[in-house]
């Protein structure tokens, strides 16, 4: 009983701490001497790093943020926790990325970390979701729109992956991750509706 409870709590704490690693903030601070929270969109994610620092740092931040989500799930799996706790660890990583304790609870928008979580939980769903993101991005050149559409597609992708028999925890995380990503993009939605959302290559 104690070992089981300890493992569950450990997975949540590690998930949050992994997610809260401020890779974008650190990259901008070390390479450009700026506080990313005070530049552009104010997000500490890869898109704002791209606009404020450059392509190379943005790619590195993206890969690190993906790794945070995947690692959180894999740690829970290594602890032999059930699907529900693996999912919870992934969501803890998303929460850490969005609300990092180190940065006054102001972080990123959980897109890359959410992708990493999906790759850890069900890699076909993660790849399909990323494919939708890239497809929309290739036509629109708007990262936020691509992220929102990919997030909205997630529950359907999860249902299709398991042919209507998705594990309850997986279906729950699909809806939870969708809600978190869309909620974090609410200011982007306002700009999209107003026609003022910047495209790739434009400053925010």
Swiss-Prot record:
Gene Ontology CC annotations of this record: plasma membrane
Membrane-topology descriptor: Multi-pass membrane protein
Catalytic activity: an acyl phosphate + sn-glycerol 3-phosphate = a 1-acyl-sn-glycero-3-phosphate + phosphate
A Pfam family that the UniProt record links to this protein: G3P_acyltransf
Subcellular location: Cell inner membrane
Keywords attached to this entry: Cell inner membrane, Cell membrane, Lipid biosynthesis, Lipid metabolism, Membrane, Phospholipid biosynthesis, Phospholipid metabolism, Transferase, Transmembrane, Transmembrane helix
InterPro entries named in the record: G3P_acylTferase_PlsY (IPR003811)
Role description: Catalyzes the transfer of an acyl group from acyl-phosphate (acyl-PO(4)) to glycerol-3-phosphate (G3P) to form lysophosphatidic acid (LPA). This enzyme utilizes acyl-phosphate as fatty acyl donor, but not acyl-CoA or acyl-ACP.
Protein's name in the database: Glycerol-3-phosphate acyltransferase
Gene (name only): plsY
């Amino acid at each position: 009983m104690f070992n089981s409870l300890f493992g569950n709590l450990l997975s949540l704490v590690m998930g949050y701490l992994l997610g809260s690693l401020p890779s974008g903030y650190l990259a901008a601070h070390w390479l450009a001497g700026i506080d990313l929270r005070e530049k552009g969109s104010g997000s500490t994610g890869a898109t704002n790093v791209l606009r404020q620092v450059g392509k190379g740092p943005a790619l590195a931040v993206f890969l690190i943020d993906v790794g945070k989500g995947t690692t959180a799930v894999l740690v829970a799996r290594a602890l032999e926790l059930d699907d529900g706790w693996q999912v919870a660890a992934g969501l803890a990583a998303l929460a850490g990325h969005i609300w990092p304790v180190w940065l006054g609870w102001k972080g990123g928008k959980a897109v890359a970390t959410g992708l990493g979580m999906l790759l850890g939980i069900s890699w076909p769903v993660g790849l399909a979701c990323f494919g939708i993101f890239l497809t929309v991005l290739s036509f629109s050149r708007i990262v936020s729109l691509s992220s929102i559409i990919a997030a909205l597609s997630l529950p359907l992708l999860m249902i299709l992956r398991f042919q209507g028999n998705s594990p309850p925890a997986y279906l729950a995380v699909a809806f939870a991750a969708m809600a978190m990503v869309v909620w974090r993009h609410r200011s982007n939605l306002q700009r999209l509706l107003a026609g003022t959302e910047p495209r790739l290559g434009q400053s925010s």
